[in-house]
Structures are given as C-alpha cells and as structure tokens.
C-alpha cells in the first residue's frame, strides 16, 4: 500500500478517517456500503426519500465490537466516516486542498469477473491522488464448492471450507494480484502481508452473505492509525469542508450536504463557497448531523467538529457548485476567498479546436475530461452545469463539424437547449458512466467523420482505381457494360475515367450493385458499370486498370484535407500518370 505519509509520533487527538468506496458497476459497491452502514445505523425506515446526510460514521465502539475476535483493542481513532455515495466519480468530486477528500478507499472487485473498465478508471484516480486503498474481493459466495458458514469473519469462514474451495479462491486472488502488478501495484491477501506500506491488502468478502466486513473495518482502522496519523490529526481551526450535494428545499431554502474534514463550524458562522458566479460569502442559519437512528433521522446542533457529515442551511439563495470547498471565515476573508478560488480551478488541458464538456461538479468534469483526452479527443471548453441553449448556439458555430459535440456527464439537457437542437447539427452525448460516455463520444465523432468524408467524396471526383473483370463482359459498346472490381476510393455516376497511359477511357453512365442501381460505390466491391463514349477492345480492354480522372483542384483539396490512405496512394498513382505528359502537373496547387 502506498501511503500519503507515515509517522510514529504520538498524536493527542485524531479525527475520523474519511473512506470512499470505488469499483466497477455491479461489482457490489452499494451492497457492501449498505452492509458497512448497517453496522452503525440501528434501524432503517422503509419508503420515502432519505433525509440522511450522505456520510455515515462507524464509531470506534462498533468497530471494536465487530472486530473483538481480531485483536484490535489498541485502536485510538474515534471511528471511520464513510461517504455514502460510492464510485470513482463521487471520489473525484470530493476534494480537499487540492487532493482527495478521502483518506482511504475501498476498491470493490468482483472476484469472479476481475478487473473491469471502471476498476481501471478507479485505480488511475487513486494513483493520481496518492490515496491509500484496500481491495474488497467481493462475491466469494459464488465461487465453486462454497459452503455456507454462520460467521461474519472471513478468517473463521475460510477455516471451514473444503480444500477445493480454498484452491479456487486462491486462484482468483492470484489472478487479481497479477493484473494489479501490471499497474505497478503489489498486492496480497490481507492475512499474508507483513508490510502494509508496500503491499495492497485484498480482503475476500461476500456482501450478500455478510462475510468479511469485520476484516475490512480492522484493516482500514489499522492502516489509518498506523500510517496516517499526521493526516488525521485533529486541528482546532476554522472549518474546512467539501460540499457533496446542493439541495433547494421549498420550505427551508438552500441546504448544503458536506463533509467537514478539518476544524469546526457553528451556527452563525460566515462561510465562503464557490458559486456559478464565483466565490461568495453566506451565513450558517442552521446545522444538522445524522443521529444514527434511521434513514430519516437528523439532529439539529449548534456546533460540529471534524470529521463529520453535515447539512448546512444557508442564509442566501446562491448557485453553489457541488464538489466545491466550503470554508469558515474568521478574520481572514481575503485569504479564504483566494483559497476558494484556487481550490475551484479546473485543471483541464484545453485546445483551440475540440468538443464542449459539461459536468455536475469540478471533480467529475476533470475525471471525464481526463478520460476523453486519453483517447485523443480534444476539448475546447469544459464547464460545470447543465447543458444550455447558449452551449448549443456556441457549439453550432464551431468551424469543424466533427467537433460540434457536447458531452454531458451527470447533467441535464435544459428544455430550451433541446428546442435549439432541432435547428442545429449539434450532437449531445450524456450519461453517468465514464467509459460508456467516452465510447459513445468516439462513435459519434467517427460517424461525423464518416458523414463529412462522404459529403466531400460526393462533391468532387475521388482518386479511385477499378479493374475490368474479363469474365463479366456484358456489352462491347453504346454503352460498354462490364463487371469491375472497385479497388480503391469511390466511383460515381458521371466520373470520367483514364487509362494507365493517361488517355480518356469513357464516362461512367450507371452503376449496379447486384440488382440495385446506385449513384456511387465505395471500395472494395465488385459491381457492373455502363461506360459511355468508348468501345471495348478499342479504347479500353478486358483486364484494363482504369482510374477516375481528377483535376489539379482536387489535388489541392486533398493535400489540404487528406482522405483515407488508399485514396491518397491512388492520388499519387494518378499524379505519376499525368506527369508523363506534363512534368509539372499537380505542382502549382
């Protein structure tokens, strides 16, 4: 495990380490998180919209109770604070002073499926933020030879399994270890590790059967206390928090769900936040925390200390940006406003030409932009917020039609934007899974390139080569009708043809592909063509190779904006043919 830092220095007071859960879709993130939350939430009220703040504390008394058979009596941390929203997008959105809000992470991997696309995205993000993490190898109950055992401890469970099951489990763990090694990560099963600073712990679990959660809590708590004491040392300073969600309550006003990761916050405090119009200051009208007594249970308080999930009712109606910082202002307004501005900067490389990207928060904007850039997709503009009519209007005027695309990640397309789309050629790609959005964006770009290329091909003669098939001679004159193989490019009705010596070889009158008459035909294909103004065995012959005739203007256009390699190679063949009569043909363009 790569830690942020390590220290043996004794610390007088520690705050709760903050934990985020990541992993591929359907690998069990939410189920595992619910199971962990179940160790701290006494009861859950069915139905209705949850009124809980999206962060759950598992206090030290519960951790000690869950892990009492695992020798964890020396723990000094007050508990673990789990971010309730799983996924690498949530992780990316939760920042703290330029780094990740989470002190630790759980990467959930389906032990039977192994590492998948979103697993890779999660690993990339964890490495980027240098966040220590453990692996929950989930769904061990689906491994062959599984025997159900009445225990929630993996260490007890594994001792009661058949050897065939143990072998199957080890094979799957070794497979994950080998794959992780390709990413430069050393890993092993948690109970086989001697140095946790160098090796990532893999904890086999079954979220469905409630196996392995005590070991998850034990490893997380132990790692935090042993290697992250400096990071989780409590400091009595003005409060620093990260906003998870912005809510507009009709009766109350605007509330901010946030994770307070350092210092304190009180009712009446002035707080600085980032809005769509830049940094702003507002006041705390009320503070709420979870009570731990159910999904709908909130408790109003006057003051909160880190680390804790909080709900803040603010005094002003301002457009606060989710994922942005929230800092308590004492006598340091200028410094805090500068800090808000710095932490809210978007770190995305932009290009003179490219697509537009919109996302719900700064972190997700950076996450989707990073993946798009990795695939060579250039970005001209990246902003937080829903897709608006102004976005449609701006993108519709981009000079390159291929870039007239707006990618929306976890955002809505406003009604006025949908109306504007009907009269524009702008494409919108939206979704909530990064790798799927990237795939869809690439498909849209490829389709746009194809359509643009087809439009160009239809507007001018395309350098093409065809070969007459001697076994398919249907008529010798008026017009010649023969079967041909289109070897490169695209032939069209009306194209003039030349021979290999540059002499005129007729004009294409019609094209038939099987029993269908077509206006054009792309290579490779075999079709029948009718050729006007020539006679077979006089101007053209069976086995002849013919070319579509082009002008010097076509050479100029293709050198400015090339087509496929086969077409460009055929262009060079035609230039060589033309230069037999005119050595300077195609040079004055």
Swiss-Prot record:
<dbReference type="GO" id="GO:0003924">
    <property type="term" value="F:GTPase activity"/>
</dbReference>
<dbReference type="InterPro" id="IPR036925">
    <property type="entry name" value="TIF_IF2_dom3_sf"/>
</dbReference>
<dbReference type="GO" id="GO:0003743">
    <property type="term" value="F:translation initiation factor activity"/>
</dbReference>
<feature type="region of interest" description="G1">
    <location>
        <begin position="23"/>
        <end position="30"/>
    </location>
</feature>
<protein>
    <recommendedName>
        <fullName>Probable translation initiation factor IF-2</fullName>
    </recommendedName>
</protein>
<keyword id="KW-0547">Nucleotide-binding</keyword>
<keyword id="KW-0342">GTP-binding</keyword>
<dbReference type="GO" id="GO:0005525">
    <property type="term" value="F:GTP binding"/>
</dbReference>
<feature type="binding site">
    <location>
        <begin position="23"/>
        <end position="30"/>
    </location>
    <ligand>
        <name>GTP</name>
    </ligand>
</feature>
<dbReference type="Pfam" id="PF00009">
    <property type="entry name" value="GTP_EFTU"/>
</dbReference>
<dbReference type="GO" id="GO:0005737">
    <property type="term" value="C:cytoplasm"/>
</dbReference>
<keyword id="KW-0396">Initiation factor</keyword>
<dbReference type="Pfam" id="PF14578">
    <property type="entry name" value="GTP_EFTU_D4"/>
</dbReference>
<dbReference type="InterPro" id="IPR000795">
    <property type="entry name" value="T_Tr_GTP-bd_dom"/>
</dbReference>
<feature type="binding site">
    <location>
        <begin position="84"/>
        <end position="88"/>
    </location>
    <ligand>
        <name>GTP</name>
    </ligand>
</feature>
<feature type="region of interest" description="G4">
    <location>
        <begin position="138"/>
        <end position="141"/>
    </location>
</feature>
<dbReference type="InterPro" id="IPR029459">
    <property type="entry name" value="EFTU-type"/>
</dbReference>
<keyword id="KW-0648">Protein biosynthesis</keyword>
<feature type="region of interest" description="G3">
    <location>
        <begin position="84"/>
        <end position="87"/>
    </location>
</feature>
<dbReference type="Pfam" id="PF11987">
    <property type="entry name" value="IF-2"/>
</dbReference>
<feature type="domain" description="tr-type G">
    <location>
        <begin position="14"/>
        <end position="229"/>
    </location>
</feature>
<dbReference type="InterPro" id="IPR009000">
    <property type="entry name" value="Transl_B-barrel_sf"/>
</dbReference>
<feature type="binding site">
    <location>
        <begin position="138"/>
        <end position="141"/>
    </location>
    <ligand>
        <name>GTP</name>
    </ligand>
</feature>
<dbReference type="InterPro" id="IPR005225">
    <property type="entry name" value="Small_GTP-bd"/>
</dbReference>
<dbReference type="InterPro" id="IPR004544">
    <property type="entry name" value="TF_aIF-2_arc"/>
</dbReference>
<feature type="region of interest" description="G5">
    <location>
        <begin position="206"/>
        <end position="208"/>
    </location>
</feature>
<feature type="region of interest" description="G2">
    <location>
        <begin position="48"/>
        <end position="52"/>
    </location>
</feature>
<comment type="function">
    <text>Function in general translation initiation by promoting the binding of the formylmethionine-tRNA to ribosomes. Seems to function along with eIF-2.</text>
</comment>
<dbReference type="InterPro" id="IPR027417">
    <property type="entry name" value="P-loop_NTPase"/>
</dbReference>
<dbReference type="InterPro" id="IPR023115">
    <property type="entry name" value="TIF_IF2_dom3"/>
</dbReference>
<comment type="similarity">
    <text>Belongs to the TRAFAC class translation factor GTPase superfamily. Classic translation factor GTPase family. IF-2 subfamily.</text>
</comment>
<dbReference type="InterPro" id="IPR015760">
    <property type="entry name" value="TIF_IF2"/>
</dbReference>
């Amino acid at each position: 495990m790569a830690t942020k830092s390590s220290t043996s220095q004794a610390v007088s007071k520690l705050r709760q380490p903050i934990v985020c859960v990541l992993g591929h879709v359907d690998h069990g993130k939410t189920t595992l998180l619910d199971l962990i939350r179940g160790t701290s939430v006494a009861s859950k009220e069915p139905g209705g919209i949850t009124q809980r703040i999206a962060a759950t504390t598992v206090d030290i008394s519960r951790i000690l109770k869950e892990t009492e058979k695992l020798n964890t009596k020396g723990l000094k941390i007050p508990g673990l604070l789990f971010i309730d929203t799983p996924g690498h997008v949530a992780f990316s959105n939760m920042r703290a002073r330029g780094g990740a809000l989470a002190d630790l992470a759980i990467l959930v991997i389906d032990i039977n499926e192994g590492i998948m696309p979103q697993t890779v995205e999660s690993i990339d993000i964890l490495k980027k933020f240098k966040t220590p993490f453990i692996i929950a190898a989930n769904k061990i109950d689906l491994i062959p030879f599984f025997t159900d055992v009445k225990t929630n401890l993996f260490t007890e469970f594994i001792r009661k399994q058949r050897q065939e099951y143990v072998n199957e489990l080890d094979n799957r763990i070794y497979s994950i270890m080998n794959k992780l090694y390709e990413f430069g990560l050393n890993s092993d099963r948690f109970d086989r590790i001697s140095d946790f600073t160098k090796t990532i712990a893999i904890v086999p679990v079954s979220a469905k059967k409630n196996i392995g959660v005590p070991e998850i809590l034990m490893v997380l708590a132990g790692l935090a206390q042993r290697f992250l004491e400096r990071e989780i040392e409590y400091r009595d300073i003005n409060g620093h928090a990260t906003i998870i969600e912005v809510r507009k309550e009709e009766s109350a006003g605007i509330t901010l769900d946030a994770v307070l990761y350092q210092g304190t916050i009180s009712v009446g405090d002035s707080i600085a936040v980032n809005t769509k119009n830049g940094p702003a200051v507002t006041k705390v009208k009320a503070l709420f925390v979870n009570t731990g007594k159910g999904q709908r249970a909130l408790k109003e308080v006057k003051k909160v200390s880190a680390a804790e999930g909080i709900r803040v009712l603010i005094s002003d109606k301002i457009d606060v940006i989710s994922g942005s910082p929230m800092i308590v202002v004492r006598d340091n307004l200028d410094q805090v406003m500068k800090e808000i501005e710095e932490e809210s900067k978007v770190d995305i490389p932009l290009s003179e030409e490219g697509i537009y990207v919109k996302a719900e928060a700064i972190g997700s904007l950076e996450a989707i932009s990073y993946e798009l850039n990795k695939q060579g997709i250039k970005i001209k503009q990246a902003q937080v917020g829903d897709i608006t009519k102004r976005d449609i209007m701006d993108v519709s005027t981009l000079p390159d039609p291929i870039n007239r695309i707006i990618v929306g990640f976890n955002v809505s397309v406003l009604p006025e934007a949908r109306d504007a789309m009907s009269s524009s050629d702008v494409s919108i790609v939206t979704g909530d899974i990064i790798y799927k959005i990237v795939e869809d964006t690439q498909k849209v770009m490829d389709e746009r390139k194809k359509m643009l290329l087809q439009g160009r091909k239809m507007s001018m003669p395309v350098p093409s080569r065809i070969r007459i098939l001697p076994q398919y001679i249907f008529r010798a004159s008026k017009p010649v009708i023969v079967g041909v193989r289109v070897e490169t490019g695209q032939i069209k009705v009306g194209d003039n043809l030349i021979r290999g010596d540059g002499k005129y070889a007729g004009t294409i009158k019609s094209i038939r592909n099987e029993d269908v008459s077509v206006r054009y035909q792309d290579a490779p294909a075999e079709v029948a063509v009718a050729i006007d103004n020539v006679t077979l065995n006089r101007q053209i012959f069976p086995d002849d190779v013919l070319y579509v005739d082009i002008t010097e203007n076509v050479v100029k256009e293709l050198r400015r904006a090339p087509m496929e390699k086969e077409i460009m190679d055929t262009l060079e063949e035609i230039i060589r043919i033309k230069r037999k009569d005119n050595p300077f043909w195609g040079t004055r363009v």
